[in-house]
Amino acid sequence: MAIAAATVVEAIAIRRKQLFILLMVGAVCLGTSQSVQAQCTAKNEAFQSGEHVMYDLYFNWKFIWKKVGLASLTTNATTYHSEPAFRFNLLCVGSKKTDFFFKMRDTLTCITTQQLEPLYFRKGAEEGKRYTVDEVNFSYRNGKCIVDQQRTLYGKTDKKHDEMPVCVYDMLSILLQARSYDPSDYKPGVKILFSM
């Protein structure tokens, strides 16, 4: 599991829209390391079922910002294994101009409890000339986060099983957690680490 971090000051200075963009293109990852205690929940104060948000995607290199595509995020109430849950779908599409350099068509699906605890994640990614499918199932037992993941690339599937004493998130559920935080008490230079 990779540990991703970003300075909270950057998240405060960048509007939520820009934070989302940076998270999606891998420029910024936020997080916190915490005890699982059989759950990794947060209070949802940032979104509700039926929400649909469009984002512009930008490439950032030093002082250069270039629009490279669009992203669409939808939020819906659902059930997962007969329990109430949220389903988040994110579709990222590069523009025709950027397709010349690097084609990007990503579809991400995340299912969480109503308290934003990750349950399932899938990413189908056409990036450049390759297509990958990543799937992750999360469960919680004996104070541990159990993560069963698999990646399919070029017809070959690799599977991995981890049991972690900390909360583990996927790239979409961590965004949802970050959107629910109140950064007003954070100080410059403070870092919050998340296991992903």
Where are the regions a protein language model picked out?
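Glycine-centered signal
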Residues: 6, 13-14, 30, 35
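N-terminal cleavable signal peptides for secretion/export
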Residues: 36-107, 124-131
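A structural detector for beta-sheet-dominated domains
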Residues: 56-58, 76-78, 91-93, 113, ...
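Hydrophobic alpha-helical segments and helix pairs
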Residues: 102-153
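Solvent-exposed helix/loop surface patches that form functional interfaces
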Residues: 48-50, 131-196
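Bacterial N-terminal signal peptides that target proteins for export
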Residues: 1, 8-22
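Bacterial N-terminal signal peptides
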Residues: 21-31
